[in-house]
């Protein structure tokens, strides 16, 4: 694991000691080299002997999420260049350092062997994200968004810390390898049900579960582009990863406790998709669509079947890349029009035809057509939920329909129609932006050729 953590940490001195005009180029190139060098981790031996140590381990559940995290660092750096072009060199280097620190804590979260280390790193991601939102956000509301993000996350996480200390005292270990052998004798009591709730609530806030999601649209809308990318692509997946780990350990309890959360997720999935239909703000629409997709993942994790686990992990990876790409496209519009309102960006297809092609591809993938991995993930989840209860086909089908409607609405509002006057003299699309979109799209297309490497533990 150190072969990914140490080179990532060494990007910090690289950023500070490199010459001012080479800061972006050097950090982007070296981070891209790290992401390419870490792709071999996707090949997991059956006994997991290559990636096991007392502190860190990788299995087929954490590896795809880890690779997604590492892959996103150069993309965040590429996307942020225009946003910081007017800032001082010190600001640029501080921004890059903050992103790298966030990256390191994310890598260590996905690779942690011990639950207390997972908790510490899970909370450590909060500080750099807060700094990115509140220091480099665009509007004054960023402080409000930062406080929402902070309090929701901390209020959800405090019971988890108390519960982990209780488990440590009771069982004597928090090691993820040991716990399956120690938690076999959990009884269905009120106290153990509360233990399950406190363990999962921190991750449900991070997902977020419908009802605990109010921090997400605010944080997404006010964050700069790198903040939006890392929030959508990885921080939401931290919640899914934590829930997958915890619910497998507390397995008999999950089957007693899952019903209200399943109902809430089914309801929230349709509600947030419907909210998307009446959004005027581009980033807010993409943020609410993230809540809708993550509700599907919560349903899959709660159902506790091999197919649903495979669907949850596949959809998390697919959504991470797709939503990150949509945020990059929304940001490219914002950099030209200086507004997130969709109707003001109408008619951009005639001015930026190549960017319109990227919009079309991203919108299509968001609608989950064959042969994308989005479809594979959604099919696995819908099939599993249908086998649990036939009635789930109605909210699931309605959600698929509304998702198609709001995605087409977003696409047509921003790209088609008569060009507004203020958009006549905008900048053309840059090679940097086209490269950024291609690097989002390439993994999605390649994974659709061989999806089994991201299907997780149960494949």
Swiss-Prot record:
It catalyses: a ubiquinone + NADH + 5 H(+)(in) = a ubiquinol + NAD(+) + 4 H(+)(out). Its EC number is 7.1.1.2. One of its GO terms (cellular component) is mitochondrial inner membrane. One of its GO terms (biological process) is electron transport coupled proton transport. It is found in: Mitochondrion inner membrane. It is a multi-pass membrane protein. One of its GO terms (molecular function) is NADH dehydrogenase (ubiquinone) activity. Keywords: Electron transport, Membrane, Mitochondrion, Mitochondrion inner membrane, NAD, Respiratory chain, Translocase, Transmembrane, Transmembrane helix, Transport, Ubiquinone. The chain crosses the membrane at residues 21-43, 60-80, 99-119, 147-167, 195-215, 224-244, 257-277, 284-303, 308-330, 351-371, 375-395, 436-456. Its main location: mitochondrion. Belongs to the complex I subunit 4 family. Core subunit of respiratory chain NADH dehydrogenase (Complex I) which is composed of 45 different subunits. Core subunit of the mitochondrial membrane respiratory chain NADH dehydrogenase (Complex I) which catalyzes electron transfer from NADH through the respiratory chain, using ubiquinone as an electron acceptor. Essential for the catalytic activity and assembly of complex I. This is NADH-ubiquinone oxidoreductase chain 4. It comes from Elephas maximus (Indian elephant).
